[in-house]
């Protein structure tokens, strides 16, 4: 129903923001780790998920549409409501959660408050099936860096492992390559 809201941020709290657009202030619940990227009195765009309940209407917001899509997949899982899904995304970012699922790391999922071993297993089971469609959304820059590391003689698995640990879309290619080479050179020396 609401794909995104673009407007001026009026209030920033750890778990919610108020964003004003068209003379209306929308209260939007966000993952706690997202609040550090949003500043008061700045224009921003938040991708949203509208949850209509019998007693309330809630808006959940995310900086990326892919994180919103993951939130919507999480709330489809039996026993995971919007509050638990936002709690999961407050603890782990999207890529970290994908890696946890990919490695079937029940221990890391169980560290999230409110998630026990059975719920963690259910999350792994449900999301593992859709992981290929949600897979890490690496862009052209990631592919170019991986290609450069392969051209320098590193093995694909080794280069990909290092790159997956340090890749950040906000860093420039040269910085990521330098950091990757530093780590890979350290492995060769062992």
Curated annotation (Swiss-Prot):
Region of interest (Domain I), residue spans: 1-63
GO biological process: DNA recombination; DNA repair; SOS response
Record-linked SMART domains: HhH1 (SM00278)
Electron transport found in the keyword field: no
GO molecular function: ATP binding; four-way junction DNA binding; four-way junction helicase activity
Start and end residues of each stretch annotated as Domain II: 64-139
Gene3D superfamilies to which the protein is assigned, alphabetical: 5' to 3' exonuclease, C-terminal subdomain, DNA helicase RuvA subunit, C-terminal domain, Nucleic acid-binding proteins
InterPro entries, sorted: DNA_helicase_Holl-junc_RuvA_I, Hlx-hairpin-Hlx_DNA-bd_motif, NA-bd_OB-fold, RuvA, RuvA_2-like, RuvA_C, RuvA_C_sf
Keyword match DNA damage: yes
One Gene Ontology term, aspect cellular component: Holliday junction resolvase complex
This protein's domain notes: Has three domains with a flexible linker between the domains II and III and assumes an 'L' shape. Domain III is highly mobile and contacts RuvB.
Protein function: The RuvA-RuvB-RuvC complex processes Holliday junction (HJ) DNA during genetic recombination and DNA repair, while the RuvA-RuvB complex plays an important role in the rescue of blocked DNA replication forks via replication fork reversal (RFR). RuvA specifically binds to HJ cruciform DNA, conferring on it an open structure. The RuvB hexamer acts as an ATP-dependent pump, pulling dsDNA into and through the RuvAB complex. HJ branch migration allows RuvC to scan DNA until it finds its consensus sequence, where it cleaves and resolves the cruciform DNA.
Family: Belongs to the RuvA family.
Name used for this protein in its record: Holliday junction branch migration complex subunit RuvA
């Amino acid at each position: 129903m609401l794909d995104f809201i673009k407007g001026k941020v009026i209030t920033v709290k750890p778990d919610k923001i108020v964003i004003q657009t068209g003379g209306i202030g929308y209260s939007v619940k966000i993952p706690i780790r997202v609040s550090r990227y949003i500043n008061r009195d700045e224009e921003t765009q938040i991708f949203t998920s509208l949850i209509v309940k019998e007693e309330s209407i809630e808006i959940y917001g995310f900086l990326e549409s892919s994180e919103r899509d993951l939130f919507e997949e999480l709330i489809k899982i039996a026993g995971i409501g919007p509050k638990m899904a936002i709690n999961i995304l407050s603890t782990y970012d999207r890529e970290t959660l994908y890696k946890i699922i990919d490695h079937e790391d029940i221990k890391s999922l169980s560290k999230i408050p409110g998630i026990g071993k059975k719920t963690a297993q259910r999350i792994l089971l449900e999301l593992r099936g859709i992981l290929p469609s949600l897979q890490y959304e690496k862009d052209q820059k990631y592919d170019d860096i991986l290609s450069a590391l392969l051209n320098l003689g590193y093995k694909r698995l080794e280069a990909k492992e290092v790159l997956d640990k340090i890749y950040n879309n906000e860093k420039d290619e040269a910085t990521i390559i330098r950091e990757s080479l530093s780590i890979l050179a350290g492995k060769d020396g062992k």
